[in-house]
A protein has these predicted regions:
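Conserved lysine of the Walker
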Residues: 17
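Pre-Walker A (Motif I) flank of P-loop NTPase domains
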Residues: 2-6
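P-loop (Walker A) phosphate-binding loop of NTP-binding proteins
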Residues: 12
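Conserved substrate/cofactor phosphate-moiety recognition/catalytic segment
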Residues: 26-64
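A glycine- and Lys/Arg-enriched "phosphate-lid" helix/loop adjacent to the NTP-binding pocket
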Residues: 92-151
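A basic- and aromatic-enriched beta-loop-alpha substructure that forms the phosphate/nucleotide-
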Residues: 65-103
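Hydrophobic anchor at the beta1->P-loop junction of P-loop NTPases
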Residues: 9
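Post-Walker A alpha-helix
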Residues: 20-21, 25
Length: 151
């Protein structure tokens, strides 16, 4: 296990992962690793037709997170520079299991295992939770903010 502090913050959408990660990184003077969602070119199509676009969407996220974690390991962890992330790569397999048909999931799982077998894993995982009512309010606010920014 890596002795350099590597903290991952996880939880459902809208729970405050990014906010807490940012605060922790600032307070502890750690590098902040933020999840990149907006760059996924398949996400819009995914929300319109999950069955058609789930495999491409999940593969993009997996490859993107693989590259991020590979870079973080090389640039920070191997140089004893601590990191806090607002996601854990394990979420990929959880989402894939929920969105992919079995045929695609089996392929995805094989790729996931190959890519993640030697990735750095956090030595601390913080899991946040909130009531469904709170999560719905927060995601509604995020959608309003995101749509106003897009204009």
């Amino acid at each position: 296990m890596n002795s350099t502090p590597f903290i991952a913050v996880e939880g459902p959408i809208g729970v405050g992962k990014t906010s807490l990660s940012h605060r922790l990184a600032t307070y502890l003077q750690f590098h902040l690793l933020r999840e990149i969602v907006e760059e996924n070119p398949f996400l819009k199509d995914f929300y319109q037709n999950i069955d058609e676009w789930s495999f491409q969407t999940e593969m993009f996220f997996l490859c993107n997170r693989y590259k991020q974690l590979e870079d973080v390991e090389a640039r920070f962890l191997t140089k004893q520079k601590p990191v806090v992330a607002d996601y854990h790569v394990l979420k990929n397999i959880v989402f894939a299991k929920r969105t992919l048909h079995m045929k695609h999931y089996n392929k995805y799982e094989r790729v996931y295992k190959v890519l993640t077998e030697d990735l750095p894993m956090p030595n601390i995982i913080v899991y946040l939770n909130a009531s469904l009512e709170t999560l719905l309010k927060r995601t509604d606010k995020q959608q309003l903010t995101d749509s106003s920014v897009a204009l």
